[in-house]
Amino acid sequence: MHYIVMDLEWNQSPRGRAGKCGDMPFEIIEIGAVKLDEQLQEVGQFHEFIKPAVYRQLHYKTKEILNLDVKELEQCRGFKPVIQDFLDWCGDDYLICTW
């Protein structure tokens, strides 16, 4: 079994709650992860930014924390192919750990 220690970065409406899109207050724009074996030794890394589909402008705090510009994200792939690659990278026997 592998342990997948992952971190997600999120964006939200640049207008805060007033601009929230239905039941989707946040959108994943980055997936980062480290794969550990059963001895907790690192055996792989995954990192990819994701092109926003819902909130195409960055919230000011997201921009500040990640030091990103939305133009950089526009060049990235969308969520579906990225999450599929991530799940393929995880393998068949894994446990996801996050905070």
Where on the chain are the PLM-derived regions?
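Conserved non-catalytic scaffold segment of RNase H-like nuclease domains
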Residues: 2-99
